């Protein structure tokens, strides 16, 4: 690299976001965080590779934004309050314009999520971004994938399927005449929103929770396996957006909602008498047994990194 690692960090990655938990941030050998008394720490990490997780021509600001939101979504699924983030960035070269754009997107998403950047690493190689996020909850109030029980309702936030349509638009495989609809769907892929506030609400009422990254059916399968139950999904109940339904037929819209992935919505189970939070929809139920069932099974049920 033409710039030293120290110069890169100082120039592009210092002062991105603020957080009450940060005692010491970027610039020392390690960061120092203050965990609130009576709380426990949640930590998660996500790696994004060019070509596997984002398109080669995606703007650097969008790559940064998407990478942090994907990691933050794991905190949302636990019901955690965000504290801080770490970034490990592998670059083929030190491109000042690319780094400036990346830093802009990174600063925006760190501020929006409450995940100030407190450290990380840079090295040379094929483009890859690893984001580690930290959050906290009261010691006995975090969510897991393992609490669903027969009789619970299966619910989802938002409108899954939009991100899959957005990816097809960005790849040039889906042509949309209405530029505003095209932009809305593309943004669902490039600029997802981690449901952090919803997650903090759900931790008091949900029996189990997971974020949708691999696809709704695949992630429902994770809930079922971890909880030792069976889950039934009713595709007629899927909350499909008007934008999605305006660009593809109903069957394709359902398939993307069930298997598209990259939605970063929350999929969760609620006891039968618990009120459903605003912006969420019941799409199935938990029963005794194992596995998942659905009246419609897409050709590909979800993303598997090692299936190809």
Where are the regions a protein language model picked out?
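Extreme N-terminal cap/leader segments of soluble proteins
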Residues: 1-53, 57-59, 78, 87
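Glycine-rich anion/phosphate-binding loops
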Residues: 24, 56-70, 94-104
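Residue-level signal for inorganic ion chemistry
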Residues: 32, 71, 79, 117, ...
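Glycine-/charge-enriched secondary-structure boundary and capping motifs
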Residues: 1-15, 92-116, 123-129, 134, ...
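Active-site glycine-rich loop that binds ribose-phosphate moieties when present
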Residues: 131-143, 180-201, 249
């Amino acid at each position: 690299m033409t710039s030293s690692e120290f110069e890169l960090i100082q120039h592009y990655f210092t002062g991105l976001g603020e957080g009450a938990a940060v005692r010491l941030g970027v610039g020392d050998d390690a960061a120092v965080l203050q965990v609130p008394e009576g709380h426990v720490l949640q930590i998660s990490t996500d790696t994004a590779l060019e070509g596997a997780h984002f398109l080669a021509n995606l703007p650097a600001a969008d790559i940064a934004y998407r990478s942090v939101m994907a990691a933050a979504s794991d905190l949302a699924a636990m019901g955690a309050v965000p504290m801080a983030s770490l970034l490990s960035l592998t670059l083929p070269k030190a491109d000042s314009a690319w780094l400036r754009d990346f830093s802009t997107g990174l600063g925006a998403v760190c501020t929006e999520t409450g995940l100030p950047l407190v450290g990380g690493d840079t090295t040379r190689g094929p483009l890859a971004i690893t984001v580690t996020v930290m959050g906290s909850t009261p010691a006995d109030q975090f969510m897991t994938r393992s609490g669903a029980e027969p009789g619970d309702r299966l619910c989802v936030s938002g409108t899954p399927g939009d991100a899959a349509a957005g990816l097809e638009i960005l790849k040039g495989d889906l042509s949309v005449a209405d530029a505003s609809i095209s932009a809305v769907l593309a943004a669902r892929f490039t600029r997802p929103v981690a449901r952090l506030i919803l997650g903090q609400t759900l931790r008091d009422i949900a029996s189990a929770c997971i974020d949708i990254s691999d696809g709704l059916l695949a992630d429902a399968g994770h809930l079922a396996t971890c909880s030792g139950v069976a889950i039934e999904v009713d595709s007629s109940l899927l909350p499909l957006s008007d934008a999605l339904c305006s660009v593809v037929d109903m069957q394709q819209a359902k398939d993307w909602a069930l298997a598209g992935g990259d939605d970063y919505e929350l999929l969760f189970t609620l006891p039968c008498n618990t009120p459903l939070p605003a912006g969420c929809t019941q799409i199935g139920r938990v029963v005794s047994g194992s596995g998942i069932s659905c009246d419609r099974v897409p050709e590909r049920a979800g993303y598997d990194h090692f299936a190809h």
